[in-house]
Amino acid sequence: MGKTGIQLFDDSRNGFFSVSDLGFDSSLNSSNYHPIGGLFASVNQTNPFASLSSSDLSNRGNNSFSTQLNDLYTKYMPGKEEEEEVVNGEKRKRKKKGGLTLKIKIANPSLRRLLSGAVAGAVSRTVVAPLETIRTHLMVGSGGNSSTEVFSDIMKHEGWTGLFRGNLVNVIRVAPARAVELFVFETVNKKLSPPHGQESKIPIPASLLAGACAGVSQTLLTYPLELVKTRLTIQRGVYKGIFDAFLKIIREEGPTELYRGLAPSLIGVVPYAATNYFAYDSLRKAYRSFSKQEKIGNIETLLIGSLAGALSSTATFPLEVARKHMQVGAVSGRVVYKNMLHALVTILEHEGILGWYKGLGPSCLKLVPAAGISFMCYEACKKILIENNQEA
């Protein structure tokens, strides 16, 4: 029989407690016994913390095997204190908060961003799902004429679960889209942003261009799903399901049909994404400059993200109104607009400037908290997903 071994203490880890490095070798020859350093319980009094980690285990013989778990760290900070850090040549104070902090080690930076974006999209969509449900009921005129009446009607007939009806489908759609959007923004923004103290080589802000790229990427990824979703809703009985709809559209109408009407959607999405990310990036820089702190807390990120969402929604809402007017322009009794500029001018002439912002309130009710929660979750996940042990 082979033996298994566990090394219980290893002071070289300097305070790490690890169970996911826990591995074992089993050898047919008892003389080939190789204990694998796995469970560490040595705690440093000056910086006590616990960690769950794993390392790549190599084969220790022809007749041996090993098991390993994912990298998972927890770090406990016993008290509140301040420490100084140097950022771009300036000394800034950073608060260290007590509590238990979870760290997950993922070496690939792209994977860290994608996972953070997916979590951000799923959480933000779930949190605002009740608002989306109430807004949908108001649009179709079911359940009441006000948000309060609709909420009471849903709670009476369906309970809390009624507020989250259809949320799983939205999460499946939004999570990968948000992951790609945030990944593209951060990647492009880092590539285009000049080093500290140097002038930018491009005439427009890097975050504005990166936001536009993020909007284009997100739209290109999700547009076929939106089109199929619309077909399934309107043309009931034609398709058996989502995969059948995809196959029939590609087979009978061609792959380009999946992107029919893409241009108007880009006109609506890209300006919002560009201004949203530009506002978020600018507000974060302004906060750092004002507070003299490099680290931005979760509550501050929530407020900054919400404010960025409000600013971008207000700035681009006239384009959204014009786009919707163009979509219904062929209906009897309505003006047929030549282009978006013509639609904007016509709305201004007939309804005044307030016509550009009709419906802004209900739209912000959903978009503003969703933007804040999404950015907060994204930044929080980036702090949890680390590259190496030193970041713990």
From Swiss-Prot:
Belongs to the mitochondrial carrier (TC 2.A.29) family. The chain crosses the membrane at residues 113-133, 168-188, 204-224, 263-283, 302-322, 359-379. Probable mitochondrial adenylate carrier that catalyzes the transport of ATP, ADP and AMP, but not ADP-glucose. Recombinant BT1 shows a unidirectional mode of transport in intact E.coli cells. May function as a plastidial nucleotide uniport carrier required to export newly synthesized adenylates into the cytosol. May be involved in abiotic stress response. This is Adenine nucleotide transporter BT1, chloroplastic/mitochondrial. It is a multi-pass membrane protein. InterPro entries: Mit_carrier, Mitochondrial_sb/sol_carrier, Mt_carrier_dom_sf. The lineage of its organism: Eukaryota, Viridiplantae, Streptophyta, Embryophyta, Tracheophyta. Its main location: plastid. Solcar repeats lie at residues 108-191, 202-286, 296-384. Disruption phenotype: Impaired growth, flower and silique development, and production of shrunk and sterile seeds. It is found in: Plastid, Chloroplast inner membrane; Mitochondrion inner membrane. Inhibited by pyridoxal 5-phosphate but not mersalyl. Expressed in root tips, the central cylinder of young roots, and maturating and germinating pollen. It comes from the Eukaryota. Keywords: Chloroplast, Membrane, Mitochondrion, Mitochondrion inner membrane, Plastid, Plastid inner membrane, Repeat, Stress response, Transit peptide, Transmembrane, Transmembrane helix, Transport. The growth retardation observed in plants silencing BT1 is circumvented by adenosine feeding. It holds the Pfam family Mito_carr. GO terms for biological process: transmembrane transport. One of its GO terms (cellular component) is plasma membrane.
